[in-house]
Amino acid sequence: MLSSNGWRALVLSLALVPQAVADICATLEAGGIEIEKRISLAYQTDLTEYWSTACGDLKPTCIAAPSSAAEMAQVIKNLHDVETLFAIKSGGHNPNNGFASIQDGLLVSTKNLDQVDYNPEDHTAVIGPGLSWEEAQQGLAGTGRTIVGGRMGGVGVGGYMVGGGMSFLSSQYGWAANNVKDFEVVLANGSIVHATETENPDLFMSLKGGGNNFGVVTAYTMQTHPQDHKVWGGNYVYTADKASEILTAVRNFTDEYPDDKAAIIVTFERSLVIDLCILFLFYDGPEPPSGVFDEFTAIEHTSTTKTWDTYYDLLNHNNFFILKGQRYNIATETTPLPNKTVGTAPLEEYYEHFRDVTGSVLEVAGILGSIAFQPLPKTFSQRAKDRGGDLLDIPSDQPYIVIELNYSYGLSIDDSKVDAATVQLYQGMGNIVQKNIDKGLLPDVYRPLFMNDAYYRQDYWGRISPESKTLALKTRKAYDPEGFFQTRTSGGWRLKD
């Protein structure tokens, strides 16, 4: 089923003169910009690269692939001459229909914006939005440096960055967006500007968690960090009956956070034939010191952890867990961590709610449900503030867990059923959090949503602090006064008064 944004894209595109879209494809091609037409192999290949096959079901009239900021500016300027919607595609990992995909409009691919330019003098790297994170990391091979980026190598740079970006390195350096020194941006009027702490600082802050509301980012100048050593990581796999022990270990790990170089993701998966837990582990060194992961190690498991020669090797290994060829829905909730006295009761409620809702749709062909517990310890939030902050502005005096909810399944005929289950899952999760707050089991604190994991129906801007939303809205009006990106892009969380 198309999302509301996807239907909007489809209906408006069909309502407009189809020739207008064909005209802009021809205009851009005449201007020297790479254009992929529906009959081309490159076009077909691009549509198979989405994480969710539902996004690939949407067929743009053509795909434009600019290779520079100047060419991207040309695309944006030419779009003012026609009445058609467009979408921007980076890695295509966001599964929300219409966010990086479009029916009959113009799809703008950033795949040719794929530079990795390292500057050894200030240890920064210019990273293109068209890269995957494994490509970005591989581009730094031999420098002894790394960048704060995705935990799975196949995730794209572009959308990940403007959504904030959670990393295995976040407890050392904050969100990925906190490590950007300079955004190169094409604005709605086609001008190319830079956003830094001192140049267009309002735009600089708003791009760190503000999505696609302000312009098209064509390059990120990022601070790199030392990593001239091997890293350790991999997976532990547990049976589902160990859930209570695992969640206890998650709570304690997040609360005590024994080492800033350590990171985990705890993912429970359920289908008709699968019922288990996969723990992703990472340590920014050849081997974790004794005590860091001991509580997880003590639970019966199978292990594929090892020392990897490079961070790139680990990210490439993690790609095994990016299952393609399926349709995907994704959603999120943010919960404060229960204290030691309360224990894991709220976490176990979240897990049981996931099992209950998932159990109701197990007859859906090929369905696999997952719930991931992603620690957001106090040190993570403090590092984000130390590096200039962001729109999320999460307090550093309270540990949190970011919950990712996920359904993959096979057939479009089941779209409405899985959509309903997704809504039931995240709404119920939010209700459980609030119930525990009302009972005094969880603190009543600010709980923004993590954009990269959010479902299109969720109210991202309604959960951002009033101060951050006010800043973002002022920024949007200053840099896009006519609301070009609000009305002409086919998806994203709209920033309205």
Annotate each PLM feature.
Residues 1-23:
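Fungal secretory targeting signals
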Residues 439-497:
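Activity-critical C-terminal alpha-helical subdomain
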